[in-house]
Amino acid sequence: MNKTYLAPTKNYSTWYIIDAKNKNLGRLSSKIAKLLRGKNSISFTPYVNNKIYIILINSRSINVTGKKFVQKTYKRHSGYPGGLKVQKFNEILNQRPNRILEKSIKGMLPKGILGRQLFRQLKIYPDNIHPHESQQPKIITFI
């Protein structure tokens, strides 16, 4: 009887830093979601957390194509009658610049316990300043 091969778990974490300045929202989000998931690893296993941490800087200067900067809307509902809140992309970018990337990347991760663990490994900052220098992150540049 053959046994299923299980990839060995990592005991160390890998830190990456990504600059979001002038990058397209969707393209960057999908690449980050793939990295968090560990799909770039040769030992990818769907149910294993690969302990990859990503620091995303300059989220304030994310780019979108077309008229999405003024036309794209984000909706949330309180659950009460008349509780629908609608905000435009540029309003959210001015108030909470991290929220746009958080919402985009979280939607691309698995729904469940693993997805919540992976999302906690994403650190987003609106400017260049971040408190993770001691982790010595590797710089990743996307074209």
From Swiss-Prot:
Magnesium as UniProt keyword: no
Q: Which GO terms describe its cellular component?
A: chloroplast; ribonucleoprotein complex; ribosome
Q: Quote one Gene Ontology molecular function term.
A: structural constituent of ribosome
User: Signal peptide position in this chain?
Assistant: none
Q: Where is it located? A: Plastid, Chloroplast
Is Plastid given among the entry's keywords?
yes
GO annotation terms (biological process): negative regulation of translation; translation
Name the UniProt key words of this record, in alphabetical order. Answer: Chloroplast, Plastid, Ribonucleoprotein, Ribosomal protein
Subunit structure, as described in the record: Part of the 50S ribosomal subunit.
Please state which protein family the record places this protein in.
Belongs to the universal ribosomal protein uL13 family.
Recorded hits in HAMAP family, A to Z, give: Ribosomal_uL13
- Cite the PANTHER family for this sequence: LARGE RIBOSOMAL SUBUNIT PROTEIN UL13M (PTHR11545:SF2), RIBOSOMAL PROTEIN L13 (PTHR11545)
What is the name listed in the Swiss-Prot or TrEMBL entry for this protein? Answer: Large ribosomal subunit protein uL13c
